[in-house]
Amino acid sequence: MENGFNEEAVDAAVAEAQTLGEEERWDEAHSLLLEALEEQGDTPLLLCWAGIAAQRLGSDSEAYDFFRRTLALGPEDPFVLATAGSGVALFDDPGAEGALRTAALVAPDFPFARAAYGAYLAREGLFAEAIGELEAARALAPGDAEVHADLAIAYLLAARQDDGVAALEEALSLRADDAWMRALYGLALLEARRGEEAAEQLHRAAAERVEDVELQLLSALASADQGWDDEAWNALARAEAAASAPDHELIEEVEDALQEGGDAPGALLRDDLAPSLLRERLLQKA
């Protein structure tokens, strides 16, 4: 027993939670970690992993509270600093920058720490510094799809279009089943005026993310712009099936463009919908 908690018990609880998480059993991991916190009290490692579990379950406010409490204990472990720092950064917490910078400084050979700090810097608009951190992370972990994706996002936010597209291609070569990343790739291809390739990628991503209304509408317009009428109307139908009330106005606008035909779908796609959604999703991921 040290510092009021049993270190072996904490490590065992975290190891079990990690195993459950790898099996996508995050609800069980969450319950296990709450029990461990009740038994052992607040420790940075337990709080951090409780934050991870809450985040995976979509409980963002609960995750933020766990990550905030983690940092309040002054952790030194770079994984804990980088994870909790990234977690509170999503809520613009002023403690994020210090935690992420410290993690990258104390563990310069730890790719997750470098990538987490780089992603934060990209979101803050410090693109040169962000790219430096993320390129360092890529050199340390060339087989990590997430690092390539984060670097791609920094490149695209910095208007380095070709580099961003290439980094997304590399990320997808490592994790081909990531439909969210594929949708981002399709948007980047649209920005690069590679319309047919973009339509193919958006169509493929939309077939997997059927509840993503915006993606269905992007796919509908991109398909129509290529003359793929059946694919366009099928994507619109999926959007209508998944839509909630705020989506209806945009759906009607896309439907009008499909009915008008000609240049209308491509114009709505390239001049309006795609640029705004690209930036929104880049910042969402960063």
Language-model regions: role of each:
Residues 179, 183-187, 191-286:
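Eukaryotic alpha-helical solenoid repeat scaffolds
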Residues 1-12, 38:
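TPR-adjacent "capping" and linker segments in tetratricopeptide-repeat scaffold/adaptor proteins
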Residues 21, 48, 55, 88-89, ...:
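Position-specific recognition of the canonical hydrophobic site in helix A of tetratricopeptide repeat
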Residues 41, 75, 108, 142, ...:
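Short coil turns that delineate tetratricopeptide repeat
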Residues 23-31, 57-69, 88-102, 124-136, ...:
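Structural signature of tandem alpha-helical TPR/SEL1-like repeats
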Residues 4, 34-38, 68-72, 101-106, ...:
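Conserved structural position within tetratricopeptide repeats
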Residues 49, 83-84, 116, 150, ...:
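Canonical tetratricopeptide repeat
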